[in-house]
């Protein structure tokens, strides 16, 4: 008796069908791995984490990020005429962080009720997320190059010409960040999951082969242009800077001035490298370059959510770093808070009484807001 399809062909067709559904639904409920169905990837623990911890944590990051980065912008703007090149880059970095924290309320709302704000706002939020991530990494790379040229090669220029080149560089960075994020902006759309209880999501559309290729292109740009190349540039520059500063021990002030840039870069690496590792692993799984086991398929969504939270927390860490590390910045922050009425014994100004002592003793020799 002849059958039109063999059992082996049926299994292969069934596997292809489930793999396609799994790709389109972004690991939502079930997937076929190694010829058997995996259980649901989002258990009660993950559901509780998304429902309780994520809104609270993102709200805290939002508040700290807005307050901290606004204070950084106000202080740096007050010294606009005397800002160094590094501080100009840090000003734009604070702008990028501030814009990035504005997407957090949208992320919390999407996790609770799905995306209900339409395609235009979907593309806008994706643009804010990706553009500002690219700009943050590129600005940190520019800070590293700027310190490398100034310290290792002693490159100096007339102030007005140097500031003009810095502003042109910052404008170029924002343009490059937008161009790198363009694939995600163009293909972002609101899509409904394939399951009855799925919420609408703002995602990268992968409904055809061209969109899938664009998705892999955006992932490649995200890994290489957004993280790997900037980190290589930063590492190369700061190795040269540290080597040079060890030879020039008679300039301790210059050694202190470069520490904040290295610390900012280190915090960026520590916050974003775990996310890039799990996203890269997710990319390999989708390319079938690694065995897509049920364990991996169930662990990736949890790891991505946790590591993304760590990366977004970076938005509120830089202002804290400037406050605890920068002598002159700390002094200016103390004066600003005093003008705002921060004078009582229980005020924020009294939480760290050593601030004023260290600021008075060291700020006279500080020529930069980011000097230690």
Curated annotation (Swiss-Prot):
Gene Ontology molecular function, alphabetical: C-C chemokine binding; C-C chemokine receptor activity; C-X-C chemokine receptor activity; G protein-coupled receptor activity
Effect of mutating residue 34 to K: In a breast cancer sample; somatic mutation
Extracellular topological intervals: 1-55, 110-124, 189-219, 281-304
Tissue specificity field: Expression in mature B-cells and Burkitt lymphoma cells.
Recorded topology in the membrane: Multi-pass membrane protein
Domain of life: Eukaryota
Glycan-carrying positions: 28, 196
Gene3D superfamilies: Rhodopsin 7-helix transmembrane proteins
GO BP terms: B cell activation; calcium-mediated signaling; cell chemotaxis; G protein-coupled receptor signaling pathway; immune response; leukocyte chemotaxis; lymph node development; positive regulation of cytokinesis
S-S bonds: 122-202
Subcellular location: Cell membrane
Cytoplasmic side: 77-88, 146-167, 241-259, 326-372
Annotated keywords: B-cell activation, Cell membrane, Disulfide bond, G-protein coupled receptor, Glycoprotein, Membrane, Receptor, Transducer, Transmembrane, Transmembrane helix
UniProt GO cellular component terms: external side of plasma membrane; plasma membrane
TM helices/strands, residue ranges: 56-76, 89-109, 125-145, 168-188, 220-240, 260-280, 305-325
Family label: Belongs to the G-protein coupled receptor 1 family.
Protein role: Cytokine receptor that binds to B-lymphocyte chemoattractant (BLC). Involved in B-cell migration into B-cell follicles of spleen and Peyer patches but not into those of mesenteric or peripheral lymph nodes. May have a regulatory function in Burkitt lymphoma (BL) lymphomagenesis and/or B-cell differentiation.
UniProt name for this protein: C-X-C chemokine receptor type 5
Gene from which this protein is expressed: CXCR5
């Amino acid at each position: 008796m002849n059958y039109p399809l063999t059992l082996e062909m049926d299994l292969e067709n069934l596997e292809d069908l489930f793999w396609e559904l799994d790709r389109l639904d972004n690991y939502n409920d079930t997937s076929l791995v190694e010829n058997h169905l995996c259980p649901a990837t989002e258990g009660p623990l993950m559901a509780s984490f998304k429902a309780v911890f994520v809104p609270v944590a993102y709200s805290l990051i939002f508040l700290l990020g807005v307050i901290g980065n606004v204070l950084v912008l106000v202080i740096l703007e007050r010294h606009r005429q005397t800002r160094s090149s590094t501080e100009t880059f840090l000003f734009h970095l604070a702008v990028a962080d501030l814009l990035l924290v504005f997407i957090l309320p949208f992320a919390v709302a999407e996790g609770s009720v799905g995306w209900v704000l339409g395609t235009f706002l979907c593309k806008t939020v994706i643009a804010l997320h990706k553009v500002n991530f690219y700009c943050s990494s590129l600005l940190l790379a520019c800070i590293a190059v700027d310190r490398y040229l100034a310290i290792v090669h002693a490159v100096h220029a007339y102030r007005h010409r140097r500031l003009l080149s810095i502003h042109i560089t910052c404008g170029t960075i924002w343009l490059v960040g937008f161009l790198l994020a363009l694939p995600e902006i163009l293909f972002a759309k609101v899509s409904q999951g394939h399951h009855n209880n799925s919420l609408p999501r703002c995602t990268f559309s992968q409904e055809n082969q061209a969109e899938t290729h664009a998705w892999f292109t955006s992932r490649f740009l995200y890994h290489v242009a957004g993280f790997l190349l900037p980190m290589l540039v930063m590492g190369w520059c700061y190795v040269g800077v540290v080597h040079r500063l060890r030879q020039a021990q008679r300039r301790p002030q210059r050694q202190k001035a470069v520490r904040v840039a290295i610390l900012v870069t280190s915090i960026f690496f520590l916050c974003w490298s775990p996310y890039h590792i799990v996203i890269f692993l997710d990319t390999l799984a989708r390319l079938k370059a690694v065995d897509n086991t049920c364990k991996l398929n169930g662990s990736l969504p949890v790891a991505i959510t946790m590591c993304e939270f760590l990366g977004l927390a970076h938005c509120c860490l830089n202002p804290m770093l400037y406050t605890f590390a920068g002598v002159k910045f700390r002094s200016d922050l103390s004066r600003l808070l005093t003008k705002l009425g921060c004078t009582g014994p229980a005020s924020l100004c009294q939480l760290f009484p050593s601030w004023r002592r260290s600021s008075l003793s060291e700020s006279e020799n500080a020529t930069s807001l980011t000097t230690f």
